[in-house]
Curated annotation (Swiss-Prot):
This is LexA repressor. Residues 26-46 bind DNA. It comes from Phenylobacterium zucineum (strain HLK1). Belongs to the peptidase S24 family. It comes from the Bacteria.
Length: 229
């Protein structure tokens, strides 16, 4: 039987590998479990290895393999605030499966990079009908995705993301982040002490870390619309 911390770490590693294709770093594991030092992570990993849940892959950095999960894992939630967010998707190939009065037209404010930041948010260029069920309180807008860095979160090049305007976000949220006041990008936000990490959902892209004064949250992802041409 696993301890609570062993179970939390195992599920965090499992979810991160499933989401990004690579195991988390020791710093990420330490932050996720709110431990004071990496030595605690080393002890937990060793215990999970001894119990046959984890395996270290030799001669590779950040190489952990989940061998098996505890029976209760399928019903257990990951550590608080660490669940990977998958946006609600509306596929608009022909007609949206909602009545016209159940939609709201939102402004499309341009393209945003799911890759290397390419441009700041622009002015309205068009409008897109979005199901009311996808929206909550507050102001919303739409951006078109350019790039593939968020594909493991289900966000593809050419998709339209629905954003709730806000200047704050929790660690783990997918956000529109404005870097240095001029470059906008869509990434998963992680808070690392006094720093902000912008994390891709594609192992081909590195996590970028900035001081808090360099990153401004412009909004949080709430939904996704995919068109087929």
């Amino acid at each position: 039987m696993l301890t609570r911390k062993q179970h939390e770490l195992l599920m965090f590693i499992h979810e991160r590998i499933k989401e990004t294709g690579v195991s988390p770093s020791f710093d990420e594991m330490k932050e996720a479990l709110d431990l004071a030092s990496k030595s605690g992570i080393h002890r937990l990993i060793t215990a999970l290895e001894e119990r046959g849940f984890l395996r270290r892959l030799p001669h590779r950095a950040r190489a952990l393999e989940v061998v098996r999960l505890p029976q209760q894992a399928t019903a257990a939630a990951p550590p608080k605030g660490r669940a990977p967010f998958k946006p609600q998707l509306v596929e608009a190939g022909q007609a949206m499966p909602v009545a016209a009065n159940d939609t709201r037209e939102l402004p499309i404010l341009g393209k945003i990079a799911a890759g290397t930041p390419i441009e700041a948010i622009q002015q309205e260029r068009d409008r897109l009908p979005v199901p009311e069920a996808m929206l909550g309180a507050g102001e919303h807008f739409v951006l078109e995705i350019q790039g593939d860095s968020m594909i493991n979160a289900g966000i593809l090049d050419g998709d339209f993301v629905v954003i709730r305007r806000t200047d704050s976000a929790n660690s783990g949220d997918i956000v529109v982040a404005l870097v240095d006041g001029e470059e906008a990008t869509l990434k998963r936000l992680r808070k690392k002490g006094a720093s902000i990490a912008l994390e891709a959902a594609n192992p081909a892209y590195e996590t970028r870390i900035f001081g808090p004064d360099r990153v401004a949250v412009q909004g949080r992802l709430v939904g996704l619309i995919r068109r087929y041409h």
